[in-house]
Design a protein with these regions (language model features):
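Detector for outer-membrane/organellar transmembrane beta-barrel domains
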Residues: 118-197
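Outer membrane beta-barrel
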Residues: 1-108, 119, 128-135
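Outer-membrane beta-barrel proteins
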Residues: 12-16, 54-57, 110-114, 145-150, ...
Length: 197
């Protein structure tokens, strides 16, 4: 069993920062989870990064930090997000011959009498393969908005291959909503890292 409490703050003022709408004090809004782990994998409850976000930033040579990071920012705020609370995740065990993955469901905390009781719900999954220099994964997600027309789907895929002297990255991310006049965003990422020193 385990737990994880993570928050951010400005090192000069101590003001709480990041992980969602932060108040004046320190908050565990980056991650706050409890987990049960074993040979079966891991079951995790709480607030954490969404699988769609994790998969989109895996193709970024800056990860999800730094001046050059794409940050996997969604065009449908509040629907396809960086982090979600009230979630349950299952993570595959690490002994599957290089295969890894995660399934995540988030409850939107709506009353059954609400006009759209699915608002805030989120379902995502990613499956990848990592072996030697190769790492690749595919991800899918569905986020529920304030109404059915605000619902959005996300699809992304990435791959990287470590050649020793350089490591190329390539990624693709697509998000589209369910409005009568559909809005679709597609983004591509190509990067390269090289060891120095």
């Amino acid at each position: 069993a385990g737990f994880w409490l993570e928050g951010g703050m400005s090192n000069d003022t101590g003001t709480g920062q990041g992980g969602g709408a932060a108040g004046p004090g320190f908050e565990f809004k980056r991650r706050s989870t409890i987990s049960l782990m074993g040979g079966f994998g891991e079951v995790r409850l709480g607030r954490e990064l969404t699988v769609g976000y994790v998969n989109s930033t895996a193709a970024d040579v800056f990860g999800d930090n730094g001046v050059g990071a794409s940050i996997g920012k969604s065009h449908f705020a509040g629907v396809i997000e960086t982090r979600k609370g009230n979630g349950i995740s299952y993570i595959l065990p690490s002994n599957l011959g290089g295969f890894y993955g995660q399934v995540q469901y988030v409850f939107g905390e709506q009353l059954s009498s609400a006009a759209y009781d699915k608002a805030g719900d989120y379902l995502g999954a990613r499956l990848g393969y990592r072996n030697g220099p190769l790492d690749t994964a595919i991800g899918f997600a569905k986020g529920r908005g304030a109404s059915a027309a605000d619902d959005a789907d996300q699809f992304n895929i990435f791959a990287s291959y470590d050649l020793g002297v350089v490591k190329p990255f390539i990624g693709f991310n697509q998000e589209k909503n369910k409005a009568a006049v559909q809005v679709k965003y597609q983004s591509y990422l190509l990067g390269l890292t090289a060891p120095v020193g």
